[in-house]
Design a protein with these regions (language model features):
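A short, Lys/Arg-rich alpha-helix, primarily the initiator
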Residues: 1-14
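Residue-level signal for the short linker/turn that defines the boundary of a DNA-recognition helix
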Residues: 6, 16-17, 43-46
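DNA major-groove recognition helix of helix-turn-helix
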Residues: 37, 55, 63-66
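DNA major-groove recognition helix of helix-turn-helix/homeodomain DNA-binding modules
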Residues: 44-61
Length: 67
């Protein structure tokens, strides 16, 4: 089972997005995307929704609750 950071990175790469591109879509810094992808910290609930929207998946998919 993938962790949240690995899921974010995998989905980002599948969409062909760079960290700066995803950061702009979500409204955070480039560094924050790196922090999340490396499991240093997890995004707040409000950013989970923005990530899900940017990556075109549900929050449940991000959290590994559904495939």
């Amino acid at each position: 089972m993938k962790g949240l950071g690995e899921t974010i990175k995998s989905l980002r790469l599948e969409k062909g997005l760079t960290q700066p591109q995803l950061a702009k879509l979500v409204g955070v810094s480039n560094g924050m995307i790196s922090i999340w992808e490396n499991n240093i910290n997890e995004p707040k609930a409000s950013y989970l929704k923005a990530l899900a929207t940017a990556l075109d998946v549900s929050v449940s998919v991000l959290l590994g609750e559904e495939a």
